[in-house]
């Protein structure tokens, strides 16, 4: 959604708003790209809440799948998003979960710390 959107009763006009398929654990800005990393978001919360209210027991499978993603059983996703348009420029599947707020960008490199205690350095394109 582009231009002047007001979400959730906020008095702040947004330049753009996009849902992303990631539960953000880390974000970092590098020039005109924001990098977002985290486990995949596999659940539509509004739909799930409606199913819970309707006492639909099949919703438990969806909740379990989202919990498995949060636990790291599905790795994580790294998105590169344009700050100008909100468009996803690229998507990378990572085999590990980043730590909370564990991303940094410097000199064309992106650094991610993981829950396994490692640091990964990704080199940017020129």
Q: Model-predicted segments: where are they?
A:
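Extracytoplasmic/lumenal domain signature
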Residues: 1-126
């Amino acid at each position: 959604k582009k231009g002047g959107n007001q979400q959730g009763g906020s008095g702040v006009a947004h330049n753009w708003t996009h849902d992303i398929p990631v539960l953000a654990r880390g974000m970092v800005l590098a020039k005109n790209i924001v990098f977002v990393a985290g486990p995949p978001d596999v659940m539509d919360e509004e739909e799930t809440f409606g199913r819970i209210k309707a006492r639909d027991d099949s919703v438990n499978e969806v909740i379990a799948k989202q919990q498995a993603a949060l636990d790291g059983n599905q790795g994580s996703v790294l998105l590169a998003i344009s700050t100008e348009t909100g468009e996803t420029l690229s998507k990378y599947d990572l085999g590990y979960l980043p730590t909370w707020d564990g991303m940094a960008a410097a000199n064309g490199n992106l650094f991610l710390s993981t829950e396994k205690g490692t640091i990964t350095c990704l080199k940017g394109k020129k």
